[in-house]
């Protein structure tokens, strides 16, 4: 009984690792021009404050990822993630967050 449970857990764990490595992630996609412009605006608004830039970049990154599954999250989702908003493209459908969401 114990051996079979250990083997089952090992197989499930390996399957998870393989799927995770092969899944397309948001970070793997090239940044769209509209997202790059949003980052430039964040730098401009931070006025040289590196901490504010970091916070703004993290918010943009989080919103980009969250917009992939929910285009109504923020009004600028179509700019942050044009792959998925307003219409999901084939690339969008391959993303790990879209498949699991």
From Swiss-Prot:
Keyword Glycoprotein: no
UniProt record similarity statement: Belongs to the scoloptoxin-10 family.
Entry's Gene Ontology cellular component terms: extracellular region
Protein name, per record: U-scoloptoxin(10)-Sm2a
Chief location of this protein within or outside the cell: secreted
The organism's place on the tree of life at top rank: Eukaryota
Signal sequence segment: 1-23
UniProt entry keywords in alphabetical sequence: Disulfide bond, Secreted, Signal, Toxin
MF GO annotations: toxin activity
Expression by tissue: Expressed by the venom gland.
Statement: the UniProt record of this protein carries the keyword Signal: yes
UniProt-annotated location(s): Secreted
PTM text: Contains 3 disulfide bonds.
């Amino acid at each position: 009984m114990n051996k079979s449970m250990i083997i089952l857990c090992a197989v499930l764990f390996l399957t998870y690792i393989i799927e995770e490595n092969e899944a397309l992630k948001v970070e793997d996609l090239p940044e769209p021009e509209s997202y790059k412009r949003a980052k430039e605006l964040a730098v401009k608004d931070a006025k040289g404050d590196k901490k504010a830039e970091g916070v703004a970049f993290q918010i943009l990154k989080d919103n980009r990822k969250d917009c992939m599954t929910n285009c109504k999250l923020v009004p600028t989702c179509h700019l942050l993630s044009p792959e998925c908003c307003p219409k999901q493209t084939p690339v969008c459908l391959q993303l790990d967050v879209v498949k699991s969401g």
